Swiss-Prot record:
Oligomeric form and interacting partners: Monomer.
GO cellular component terms listed in the entry, alphabetical order: cytoplasm
Organism of this sequence: Salmonella agona (strain SL483)
Record-level Gene Ontology MF annotations: 3-phosphoshikimate 1-carboxyvinyltransferase activity
Record field: transmembrane: none
Binding site for phosphoenolpyruvate: 22, 96, 124, 171, 344, 386, 411
Catalytic activity: 3-phosphoshikimate + phosphoenolpyruvate = 5-O-(1-carboxyvinyl)-3-phosphoshikimate + phosphate
PROSITE patterns xref list: EPSP_SYNTHASE_1, EPSP_SYNTHASE_2
Annotated positions binding 3-phosphoshikimate: 22-23, 27, 169-171, 197, 313, 336, 340
Family, per entry: Belongs to the EPSP synthase family.
Protein name per its UniProtKB record: 3-phosphoshikimate 1-carboxyvinyltransferase
Active site, UniProt feature: 313 (proton acceptor)
Function: Catalyzes the transfer of the enolpyruvyl moiety of phosphoenolpyruvate (PEP) to the 5-hydroxyl of shikimate-3-phosphate (S3P) to produce enolpyruvyl shikimate-3-phosphate and inorganic phosphate.
Keywords, alphabetical: Amino-acid biosynthesis, Aromatic amino acid biosynthesis, Cytoplasm, Transferase
Length: 427
Protein backbone atom coordinates (compact mmCIF):
# COMPACT_ATOMS: atom_id res chain seq x y z
CA UNK A 1 0.00 0.00 0.00
CA UNK A 2 1.22 3.49 -0.80
CA UNK A 3 2.22 5.62 2.19
CA UNK A 4 3.43 9.13 2.94
CA UNK A 5 5.63 10.00 5.94
CA UNK A 6 5.31 13.60 7.13
CA UNK A 7 8.37 14.84 9.00
CA UNK A 8 7.91 17.13 12.02
CA UNK A 9 6.71 20.64 11.16
CA UNK A 10 7.99 23.61 13.18
CA UNK A 11 5.61 26.28 11.91
CA UNK A 12 2.62 26.76 9.60
CA UNK A 13 2.02 30.14 8.02
CA UNK A 14 0.36 31.72 5.00
CA UNK A 15 -2.88 31.72 3.01
CA UNK A 16 -4.80 29.11 1.06
CA UNK A 17 -7.68 29.58 -1.35
CA UNK A 18 -9.97 26.65 -0.63
CA UNK A 19 -11.26 24.19 -3.22
CA UNK A 20 -15.04 24.34 -3.72
CA UNK A 21 -17.36 22.80 -1.14
CA UNK A 22 -18.34 19.19 -1.85
CA UNK A 23 -21.79 19.70 -0.31
CA UNK A 24 -22.46 22.81 -2.38
CA UNK A 25 -20.88 21.45 -5.61
CA UNK A 26 -23.04 18.33 -5.87
CA UNK A 27 -26.26 20.08 -4.84
CA UNK A 28 -25.61 22.87 -7.36
CA UNK A 29 -24.88 20.37 -10.16
CA UNK A 30 -28.14 18.49 -9.58
CA UNK A 31 -30.24 21.67 -9.33
CA UNK A 32 -28.58 23.07 -12.48
CA UNK A 33 -29.43 19.80 -14.28
CA UNK A 34 -33.08 20.02 -13.15
CA UNK A 35 -33.39 23.76 -13.90
CA UNK A 36 -34.59 25.70 -16.93
CA UNK A 37 -31.70 27.43 -18.70
CA UNK A 38 -27.92 27.27 -18.73
CA UNK A 39 -25.88 27.60 -15.52
CA UNK A 40 -22.19 28.44 -15.19
CA UNK A 41 -20.77 27.00 -11.96
CA UNK A 42 -17.46 28.55 -10.85
CA UNK A 43 -14.99 27.11 -8.27
CA UNK A 44 -16.60 23.68 -8.63
CA UNK A 45 -14.74 21.06 -6.60
CA UNK A 46 -12.64 18.69 -8.71
CA UNK A 47 -12.90 15.45 -6.75
CA UNK A 48 -14.10 11.85 -6.92
CA UNK A 49 -17.56 12.63 -5.51
CA UNK A 50 -18.18 15.41 -8.02
CA UNK A 51 -16.98 13.20 -10.90
CA UNK A 52 -19.52 10.55 -9.89
CA UNK A 53 -22.31 13.15 -9.99
CA UNK A 54 -21.13 14.49 -13.37
CA UNK A 55 -20.90 10.96 -14.84
CA UNK A 56 -24.44 10.21 -13.65
CA UNK A 57 -25.84 13.43 -15.13
CA UNK A 58 -24.09 12.70 -18.43
CA UNK A 59 -25.63 9.21 -18.55
CA UNK A 60 -29.02 10.87 -17.96
CA UNK A 61 -28.57 13.04 -21.05
CA UNK A 62 -27.43 16.29 -19.43
CA UNK A 63 -24.97 18.29 -21.53
CA UNK A 64 -22.12 20.14 -19.85
CA UNK A 65 -18.60 21.35 -20.59
CA UNK A 66 -15.75 21.52 -18.07
CA UNK A 67 -12.75 23.85 -18.07
CA UNK A 68 -9.28 22.25 -18.29
CA UNK A 69 -8.87 22.42 -14.49
CA UNK A 70 -12.44 21.07 -14.00
CA UNK A 71 -13.44 23.97 -11.71
CA UNK A 72 -15.81 25.69 -14.17
CA UNK A 73 -18.84 23.80 -15.47
CA UNK A 74 -21.28 25.14 -18.09
CA UNK A 75 -24.38 22.99 -17.76
CA UNK A 76 -27.62 23.04 -19.76
CA UNK A 77 -30.61 22.19 -17.59
CA UNK A 78 -33.39 19.76 -18.46
CA UNK A 79 -36.16 22.11 -17.30
CA UNK A 80 -37.65 19.39 -15.11
CA UNK A 81 -37.21 15.78 -13.98
CA UNK A 82 -34.35 13.68 -15.38
CA UNK A 83 -35.21 10.75 -17.64
CA UNK A 84 -33.15 7.73 -18.58
CA UNK A 85 -33.16 6.74 -22.26
CA UNK A 86 -33.84 3.14 -21.19
CA UNK A 87 -32.91 0.82 -18.32
CA UNK A 88 -29.76 2.31 -16.78
CA UNK A 89 -27.22 1.51 -14.05
CA UNK A 90 -25.35 4.37 -12.38
CA UNK A 91 -22.17 3.69 -10.36
CA UNK A 92 -21.73 6.36 -7.67
CA UNK A 93 -18.56 5.21 -5.87
CA UNK A 94 -18.81 6.14 -2.18
CA UNK A 95 -20.44 9.52 -2.86
CA UNK A 96 -23.28 10.01 -0.39
CA UNK A 97 -23.83 13.51 -1.81
CA UNK A 98 -24.63 11.86 -5.17
CA UNK A 99 -26.41 8.67 -4.01
CA UNK A 100 -29.01 10.23 -1.68
CA UNK A 101 -30.19 13.22 -3.81
CA UNK A 102 -30.23 11.14 -7.04
CA UNK A 103 -32.16 8.33 -5.32
CA UNK A 104 -34.94 10.85 -4.71
CA UNK A 105 -34.74 12.93 -7.91
CA UNK A 106 -34.81 9.84 -10.14
CA UNK A 107 -38.10 8.71 -8.55
CA UNK A 108 -39.89 11.50 -10.46
CA UNK A 109 -41.64 10.33 -13.63
CA UNK A 110 -41.16 6.87 -15.11
CA UNK A 111 -37.59 5.57 -15.08
CA UNK A 112 -35.93 2.22 -14.56
CA UNK A 113 -32.58 3.01 -12.96
CA UNK A 114 -30.23 1.05 -10.69
CA UNK A 115 -28.02 3.05 -8.30
CA UNK A 116 -24.96 1.23 -7.00
CA UNK A 117 -21.46 1.98 -5.70
CA UNK A 118 -18.34 0.76 -3.93
CA UNK A 119 -18.57 -1.91 -1.19
CA UNK A 120 -18.61 0.78 1.54
CA UNK A 121 -21.57 2.50 -0.14
CA UNK A 122 -23.47 -0.77 0.23
CA UNK A 123 -22.90 -0.50 4.02
CA UNK A 124 -24.25 3.07 4.30
CA UNK A 125 -27.93 3.07 5.33
CA UNK A 126 -30.53 4.51 2.97
CA UNK A 127 -33.66 2.81 4.35
CA UNK A 128 -35.11 5.94 5.97
CA UNK A 129 -34.99 7.79 2.64
CA UNK A 130 -36.52 4.86 0.75
CA UNK A 131 -39.34 4.62 3.33
CA UNK A 132 -40.11 8.32 2.85
CA UNK A 133 -40.03 8.13 -0.96
CA UNK A 134 -42.37 5.11 -0.89
CA UNK A 135 -44.82 7.15 1.22
CA UNK A 136 -44.85 9.60 -1.70
CA UNK A 137 -45.63 6.85 -4.22
CA UNK A 138 -42.11 5.86 -5.34
CA UNK A 139 -41.49 2.33 -6.56
CA UNK A 140 -38.11 1.21 -5.15
CA UNK A 141 -36.53 -2.24 -4.71
CA UNK A 142 -33.46 -3.26 -2.72
CA UNK A 143 -31.26 -5.46 -4.90
CA UNK A 144 -29.02 -6.90 -2.17
CA UNK A 145 -29.47 -6.06 1.51
CA UNK A 146 -32.68 -4.50 2.85
CA UNK A 147 -32.18 -0.79 3.75
CA UNK A 148 -28.89 -0.44 1.81
CA UNK A 149 -27.86 0.24 -1.80
CA UNK A 150 -27.93 -0.92 -4.55
CA UNK A 151 -31.46 0.27 -5.35
CA UNK A 152 -33.74 -0.14 -8.36
CA UNK A 153 -35.88 2.97 -8.95
CA UNK A 154 -39.03 2.79 -11.07
CA UNK A 155 -40.40 6.32 -10.69
CA UNK A 156 -43.82 6.98 -9.20
CA UNK A 157 -43.08 9.78 -6.70
CA UNK A 158 -46.01 12.24 -6.68
CA UNK A 159 -45.62 14.05 -3.32
CA UNK A 160 -48.17 14.02 -0.49
CA UNK A 161 -47.75 13.61 3.26
CA UNK A 162 -44.32 12.20 4.16
CA UNK A 163 -42.36 11.46 7.32
CA UNK A 164 -38.56 11.27 7.35
CA UNK A 165 -36.24 10.16 10.15
CA UNK A 166 -33.78 13.01 10.72
CA UNK A 167 -31.58 11.26 13.28
CA UNK A 168 -29.14 9.39 10.99
CA UNK A 169 -28.31 11.73 8.10
CA UNK A 170 -29.53 15.16 7.03
CA UNK A 171 -28.93 14.05 3.41
CA UNK A 172 -32.23 12.13 3.47
CA UNK A 173 -34.16 15.34 4.17
CA UNK A 174 -32.01 17.24 1.63
CA UNK A 175 -32.88 14.67 -1.05
CA UNK A 176 -36.63 14.99 -0.37
CA UNK A 177 -36.53 18.79 -0.25
CA UNK A 178 -34.74 19.08 -3.61
CA UNK A 179 -37.11 16.62 -5.31
CA UNK A 180 -40.49 17.71 -3.87
CA UNK A 181 -40.98 20.95 -5.90
CA UNK A 182 -40.96 18.92 -9.14
CA UNK A 183 -43.58 16.43 -7.91
CA UNK A 184 -47.08 16.91 -9.35
CA UNK A 185 -48.70 17.29 -5.90
CA UNK A 186 -47.82 19.42 -2.87
CA UNK A 187 -45.57 17.70 -0.32
CA UNK A 188 -45.61 18.03 3.46
CA UNK A 189 -42.44 16.61 5.03
CA UNK A 190 -42.48 15.91 8.78
CA UNK A 191 -39.16 15.25 10.51
CA UNK A 192 -39.07 12.48 13.13
CA UNK A 193 -36.35 12.38 15.79
CA UNK A 194 -33.61 14.93 16.36
CA UNK A 195 -32.43 16.41 13.05
CA UNK A 196 -28.66 15.89 12.76
CA UNK A 197 -26.34 18.31 10.96
CA UNK A 198 -29.04 21.00 10.69
CA UNK A 199 -26.67 23.52 9.02
CA UNK A 200 -26.52 21.21 5.98
CA UNK A 201 -30.28 21.70 5.54
CA UNK A 202 -29.62 25.44 5.45
CA UNK A 203 -27.20 24.86 2.55
CA UNK A 204 -29.96 22.98 0.71
CA UNK A 205 -32.63 25.64 1.34
CA UNK A 206 -30.20 28.40 0.38
CA UNK A 207 -29.34 26.72 -2.93
CA UNK A 208 -32.98 25.96 -3.75
CA UNK A 209 -33.75 29.65 -3.23
CA UNK A 210 -30.85 30.57 -5.56
CA UNK A 211 -32.52 28.36 -8.21
CA UNK A 212 -35.87 30.08 -7.66
CA UNK A 213 -37.74 27.76 -5.29
CA UNK A 214 -38.75 28.70 -1.74
CA UNK A 215 -40.47 26.43 0.74
CA UNK A 216 -42.13 26.91 4.12
CA UNK A 217 -39.86 25.75 6.96
CA UNK A 218 -41.64 25.30 10.30
CA UNK A 219 -38.80 25.11 12.87
CA UNK A 220 -37.08 22.28 10.93
CA UNK A 221 -39.88 19.95 12.07
CA UNK A 222 -42.19 20.38 9.09
CA UNK A 223 -41.58 21.60 5.54
CA UNK A 224 -44.37 22.50 3.11
CA UNK A 225 -43.43 22.33 -0.57
CA UNK A 226 -45.71 23.39 -3.45
CA UNK A 227 -45.78 20.84 -6.27
CA UNK A 228 -45.58 21.47 -10.01
CA UNK A 229 -42.75 24.00 -9.73
CA UNK A 230 -39.67 24.55 -11.88
CA UNK A 231 -36.11 25.43 -10.93
CA UNK A 232 -34.61 28.37 -12.85
CA UNK A 233 -30.91 28.90 -13.52
CA UNK A 234 -29.33 31.80 -11.62
CA UNK A 235 -26.96 32.26 -14.59
CA UNK A 236 -23.56 32.24 -12.90
CA UNK A 237 -23.02 30.71 -9.49
CA UNK A 238 -19.81 30.77 -7.41
CA UNK A 239 -19.33 27.68 -5.24
CA UNK A 240 -18.02 28.60 -1.78
CA UNK A 241 -14.76 27.15 -0.53
CA UNK A 242 -15.11 23.92 1.45
CA UNK A 243 -15.44 24.81 5.14
CA UNK A 244 -14.68 21.22 6.25
CA UNK A 245 -11.42 21.36 4.25
CA UNK A 246 -10.61 24.70 5.92
CA UNK A 247 -10.62 22.99 9.32
CA UNK A 248 -7.21 21.28 8.84
CA UNK A 249 -5.43 24.53 7.98
CA UNK A 250 -7.13 26.55 10.71
CA UNK A 251 -6.23 23.83 13.24
CA UNK A 252 -2.61 23.86 11.99
CA UNK A 253 -2.55 27.61 12.63
CA UNK A 254 -3.92 27.09 16.14
CA UNK A 255 -1.28 24.44 16.91
CA UNK A 256 1.82 25.74 15.09
CA UNK A 257 1.05 29.22 13.72
CA UNK A 258 2.03 31.91 12.73
CA UNK A 259 -1.21 32.85 11.26
CA UNK A 260 -3.06 30.75 8.71
CA UNK A 261 -5.67 32.43 6.51
CA UNK A 262 -8.23 30.48 4.48
CA UNK A 263 -10.05 32.32 1.68
CA UNK A 264 -13.25 31.39 -0.14
CA UNK A 265 -15.35 31.27 3.04
CA UNK A 266 -16.03 33.88 5.71
CA UNK A 267 -18.58 35.27 8.12
CA UNK A 268 -21.29 35.24 5.42
CA UNK A 269 -20.74 31.60 4.41
CA UNK A 270 -23.80 29.32 4.23
CA UNK A 271 -21.83 26.32 5.53
CA UNK A 272 -22.28 25.37 9.16
CA UNK A 273 -18.71 24.04 9.35
CA UNK A 274 -17.37 27.62 9.59
CA UNK A 275 -18.43 27.31 13.27
CA UNK A 276 -15.34 25.10 13.63
CA UNK A 277 -13.39 28.35 14.02
CA UNK A 278 -15.46 29.17 17.14
CA UNK A 279 -14.38 25.83 18.66
CA UNK A 280 -10.70 26.65 18.05
CA UNK A 281 -11.28 30.04 19.68
CA UNK A 282 -12.85 28.33 22.68
CA UNK A 283 -9.74 26.13 22.91
CA UNK A 284 -7.47 29.21 23.03
CA UNK A 285 -6.63 30.18 19.43
CA UNK A 286 -7.17 33.69 18.05
CA UNK A 287 -9.68 33.92 15.18
CA UNK A 288 -10.20 36.85 12.78
CA UNK A 289 -13.26 36.93 10.49
CA UNK A 290 -13.69 38.67 7.13
CA UNK A 291 -16.45 38.41 4.52
CA UNK A 292 -14.26 36.14 2.39
CA UNK A 293 -11.69 34.78 4.84
CA UNK A 294 -11.07 33.26 8.26
CA UNK A 295 -7.65 33.59 9.91
CA UNK A 296 -6.33 31.62 12.89
CA UNK A 297 -3.33 32.53 15.04
CA UNK A 298 -1.65 30.14 17.46
CA UNK A 299 -2.69 30.13 21.09
CA UNK A 300 -2.13 27.92 24.12
CA UNK A 301 -4.77 25.25 23.60
CA UNK A 302 -6.85 23.68 26.37
CA UNK A 303 -9.36 20.83 26.29
CA UNK A 304 -13.10 21.26 25.68
CA UNK A 305 -16.27 19.24 26.32
CA UNK A 306 -18.80 20.01 23.58
CA UNK A 307 -21.82 18.80 21.61
CA UNK A 308 -20.56 18.56 18.01
CA UNK A 309 -23.78 17.54 16.24
CA UNK A 310 -23.86 20.81 14.28
CA UNK A 311 -20.40 20.29 12.70
CA UNK A 312 -19.88 16.52 12.44
CA UNK A 313 -17.27 16.55 9.64
CA UNK A 314 -15.15 19.39 11.03
CA UNK A 315 -15.44 17.92 14.54
CA UNK A 316 -13.10 15.12 13.44
CA UNK A 317 -10.36 17.73 13.14
CA UNK A 318 -10.93 18.66 16.81
CA UNK A 319 -10.22 15.02 17.73
CA UNK A 320 -6.63 15.28 16.44
CA UNK A 321 -6.26 18.92 17.57
CA UNK A 322 -7.02 17.56 21.08
CA UNK A 323 -3.59 15.87 20.98
CA UNK A 324 -2.11 19.37 21.40
CA UNK A 325 -4.54 20.64 24.07
CA UNK A 326 -4.03 20.58 27.83
CA UNK A 327 -6.47 18.19 29.52
CA UNK A 328 -9.12 15.71 28.33
CA UNK A 329 -11.34 16.65 25.38
CA UNK A 330 -14.84 15.17 24.98
CA UNK A 331 -16.79 15.38 21.69
CA UNK A 332 -20.47 14.49 22.16
CA UNK A 333 -23.56 13.69 20.06
CA UNK A 334 -21.53 12.42 17.09
CA UNK A 335 -23.27 9.09 16.43
CA UNK A 336 -23.56 9.94 12.73
CA UNK A 337 -19.74 9.58 12.45
CA UNK A 338 -20.55 5.86 12.38
CA UNK A 339 -22.45 6.02 9.05
CA UNK A 340 -20.01 8.16 7.07
CA UNK A 341 -17.24 7.06 4.66
CA UNK A 342 -16.23 4.59 7.37
CA UNK A 343 -17.27 4.11 11.02
CA UNK A 344 -15.36 7.24 11.98
CA UNK A 345 -15.81 6.85 15.74
CA UNK A 346 -14.15 3.44 15.70
CA UNK A 347 -11.48 4.54 13.20
CA UNK A 348 -10.62 7.73 15.08
CA UNK A 349 -10.36 5.94 18.45
CA UNK A 350 -8.19 3.16 16.96
CA UNK A 351 -5.72 5.50 15.27
CA UNK A 352 -5.51 8.01 18.17
CA UNK A 353 -4.45 5.14 20.44
CA UNK A 354 -1.64 4.29 17.99
CA UNK A 355 -0.04 7.71 18.53
CA UNK A 356 -0.25 7.25 22.32
CA UNK A 357 -3.51 8.96 23.29
CA UNK A 358 -5.80 7.56 25.96
CA UNK A 359 -9.21 7.21 24.29
CA UNK A 360 -12.70 6.30 25.43
CA UNK A 361 -15.00 5.44 22.51
CA UNK A 362 -18.68 5.71 23.43
CA UNK A 363 -21.78 4.93 21.38
CA UNK A 364 -22.06 8.60 20.35
CA UNK A 365 -19.04 10.32 21.93
CA UNK A 366 -15.25 10.19 22.09
CA UNK A 367 -13.00 11.24 24.99
CA UNK A 368 -9.32 11.97 24.28
CA UNK A 369 -6.41 12.51 26.68
CA UNK A 370 -3.13 13.35 24.92
CA UNK A 371 0.11 11.56 25.83
CA UNK A 372 3.16 13.42 27.18
CA UNK A 373 4.86 12.62 23.86
CA UNK A 374 3.25 11.49 20.61
CA UNK A 375 4.49 8.22 19.09
CA UNK A 376 5.32 7.60 15.43
CA UNK A 377 2.67 5.36 13.87
CA UNK A 378 1.37 4.09 10.54
CA UNK A 379 -2.10 5.62 10.35
CA UNK A 380 -4.80 3.57 8.66
CA UNK A 381 -7.12 5.83 6.66
CA UNK A 382 -10.02 3.41 5.96
CA UNK A 383 -10.45 4.88 2.45
CA UNK A 384 -11.67 8.01 4.25
CA UNK A 385 -10.32 11.37 3.09
CA UNK A 386 -10.97 13.03 6.46
CA UNK A 387 -8.96 10.43 8.41
CA UNK A 388 -5.91 11.14 6.22
CA UNK A 389 -6.19 14.91 6.59
CA UNK A 390 -6.96 14.86 10.33
CA UNK A 391 -3.92 12.73 11.15
CA UNK A 392 -1.57 14.90 9.09
CA UNK A 393 -1.77 17.26 12.10
CA UNK A 394 0.28 14.77 14.17
CA UNK A 395 3.35 16.05 12.26
CA UNK A 396 2.89 19.41 14.03
CA UNK A 397 4.75 17.77 16.93
CA UNK A 398 8.35 16.60 17.22
CA UNK A 399 7.28 13.18 15.89
CA UNK A 400 6.83 12.12 12.24
CA UNK A 401 3.59 10.43 11.14
CA UNK A 402 3.02 7.94 8.30
CA UNK A 403 -0.29 8.18 6.42
CA UNK A 404 -1.33 5.00 4.59
CA UNK A 405 -3.16 5.43 1.26
CA UNK A 406 -2.70 9.23 1.22
CA UNK A 407 -4.42 9.55 -2.17
CA UNK A 408 -7.80 8.89 -0.51
CA UNK A 409 -7.95 12.69 -0.04
CA UNK A 410 -9.02 12.80 -3.72
CA UNK A 411 -12.62 12.54 -2.47
CA UNK A 412 -12.56 16.25 -1.54
CA UNK A 413 -9.01 17.64 -1.69
CA UNK A 414 -6.64 15.95 -4.20
CA UNK A 415 -3.65 18.26 -3.54
CA UNK A 416 -4.08 18.54 0.25
CA UNK A 417 -0.59 17.31 1.19
CA UNK A 418 1.08 19.62 -1.36
CA UNK A 419 -0.81 22.60 0.05
CA UNK A 420 0.10 21.68 3.64
CA UNK A 421 3.79 21.32 2.66
CA UNK A 422 3.72 24.71 0.90
CA UNK A 423 2.68 26.43 4.15
CA UNK A 424 4.94 24.43 6.47
CA UNK A 425 8.44 25.10 7.81
CA UNK A 426 10.20 21.80 8.64
CA UNK A 427 11.47 21.31 12.18
Amino acid sequence: MESLTLQPIARVDGAINLPGSKSVSNRALLLAALACGKTVLMNLLDSDDVRHMLNALSALGINYTLSADRTRCDITGNGGALHAPGALELFLGNAGTAMRPLAAALCLGQNEIVLTGEPRMKERPIGHLVDSLRQGGANIDYLEQENYPPLRLRGGFTGGDIEVDGSVSSQFLTALLMTAPLAPEDTIIRVKGELVSKPYIDITLNLMKTFGVEIANHHYQQFVVKGGQKYHSPGRYLVEGDASSASYFLAAGAIKGGTVKVTGIGRKSMQGDIRFADVLEKMGATITWGDDFIACTRGELHAIDMDMNHIPDAAMTIATTALFAKGTTTLRNIYNWRVKETDRLFAMATELRKVGAEVEEGHDYIRITPPAKLQHADIGTYNDHRMAMCFSLVALSDTPVTILDPKCTAKTFPDYFEQLARMSTPA
